[in-house]
């Protein structure tokens, strides 16, 4: 598999609250800890577990967006709005999901546990893992990149599926399309694993492919629950879709910026 040396950023996403719907942005600052405002808040249980759509699918029904002051606006499925600095936010979240909960901003010196359903076909198969300090990521990699060509390739393998980018929660969506390359092969960004790429002017190490899980099958606004999404990815690409990166410096990137492989 080969990938062209360049692509174009066509979408940027961040997810201010772990497993809630994210927001599409045109420009964002980032560093080794990821996008500014990405997964910096989580909904936490009294036992110290942060809720994830892997084990609590209902949380995907809420949405979150970062305000100019750094606080987060939250809209719950029944239309109630709250915010990270609202004294009532914990009680509203608890009432919505019918359990004691609190909204928590991640600190650089603390970690939380995530309860993970490991098998989309069997909800009894689970494991727990810890988040990295300072954010509620599932991985030590802090930026997720996905190409439009990979989405198209996945959809060809299962044409009846809703292959909406929101199922896969990328930070960066790229297009390889140009006059010299037809990107319909799919999954070509995986050829960048182990290399350093530049997102605009920001260098980032491509650490690994993104292995998918039950999250891809969950229902969310406008998308149905669909186990065949995951089953199809297992057959077509060993359950992988996209790549994980870690920025090696700080900077700002924008839609329209070029992504290119740096000299190794």
PLM segments and residue spans:
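Metal-cofactor-dependent catalytic cores
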Residues: 1-264
